[in-house]
């Protein structure tokens, strides 16, 4: 399926379905793979589904759905399969063998095909199986198997977290002899949701008989919280509380030499995330962080790049980080252009995809330097610079420490202009060296903030001096004295502050 993205704001989400309801994204494994590619020249996404070692049961109607924001489109197609003529006999029990490696892709269980082959094996006649509705239940009549057995097997069909194949049915015999110890045995298989409880019930012929319960061949010990044994008349009950994935196993009830077996499947709930991954565009060497926040505890999160899973052993450039059970991160410390691509985070029942574009660093031109400022106290100081790329971000630092905006300090980035504004300048706090450092570039633009000092000398206010010059009587302009006699002039002088008296004779000071 090809999707044109030239008119789309975000990458489209494509899902594949078989029939009306089966999401093939939950069936990805060694027999079914989903791939996607992107052509930057034509801006076309190509989504592909690959079926490996196809079986006749894969035949049917398929649907592909593409969703992007408010746009939706879908297309339907049919797949026809031709079964090989050399059928041969099939050992149904060997097909149900559970592997011990515990991996998800250890095998896949195709109940539709197995039930058909089992009918052929037991009755040697062709049969037709019907699968309709949701969930799928397969019905049929057979002299070799009861309808309840078919329902239990079909009940397991579509489990997404199956990590191995059934071991229980391997031990089933073609012709089971009638049990003398059990009136009613365990059903072939049970299913329970994670966190719930389940009861396994058998009926014994002897009401005084003692039974043993085993899990994967090991005796189960009774406990108050996890395993509870009950004996009510002919019934023997094993209750398993708070089921986890560790309880997904084979169980058996033993009376003397007789045993009955069952298989318990613990189904994980579908997980979701509060926010999808976001597309990112960074420069070479700039740190990348993808964040995923899951809705439930215990979710197994898997990261992929272009459809290939990222593991700790294979990805030296990637780092996985968890913050509690809710948040998980994919970190790329020093990305290169090769790290560009589609990144996917997956968990049971949910996935999200984002694009990462890593670009080479361009040459950044400085169109306007940061100028030194000289201001007075309580004035406004504005540092401003302009660079050639409006997408370049950066930080302001003062004396080597990052400037944090507050009520007085404002930082703005408008287009190519970066501005730092300081209101009500305080000499002790704001004076210093300021620099703007653009992200991803090894240089900075610096300036100084200085203050204009105004010196004022304080002169205390003084009263004008007061001088009292009292001359007794009218003073003559000319005084005549007989030569040889002494001249005495009495002039009373007072004042505030005390005046200094200077006598002069002509132009000479006496």
From Swiss-Prot:
Domain Ig-like C2-type: 177-269, 270-347, 378-438
InterPro entries, alphabetized: Ig-like_dom (IPR007110), Ig-like_dom_sf (IPR036179), Ig-like_fold (IPR013783), Ig_I-set (IPR013098), Ig_sub (IPR003599), Ig_sub2 (IPR003598), MyBP-C_THB (IPR040849), Striated_Muscle_Regulatory (IPR050964)
Keywords for the protein's UniProt record, in alphabetical order: Actin-binding, Cell adhesion, Immunoglobulin domain, Muscle protein, Repeat, Thick filament
SMART domains membership: IG (SM00409), IGc2 (SM00408)
Keyword Repeat: yes
Tissues/organs with expression: Heart.
Protein name as it appears in the record: Myosin-binding protein C, cardiac-type
An example molecular function term from Gene Ontology annotations: myosin heavy chain binding
One GO-annotated biological process of the protein: cell adhesion
Family: Belongs to the immunoglobulin superfamily. MyBP family.
Role, per record: Thick filament-associated protein located in the crossbridge region of vertebrate striated muscle a bands. In vitro it binds MHC, F-actin and native thin filaments, and modifies the activity of actin-activated myosin ATPase. It may modulate muscle contraction or may play a more structural role.
One Gene Ontology cellular component: myosin filament
Pfam families listed in its UniProt record: I-set (PF07679), THB (PF18362)
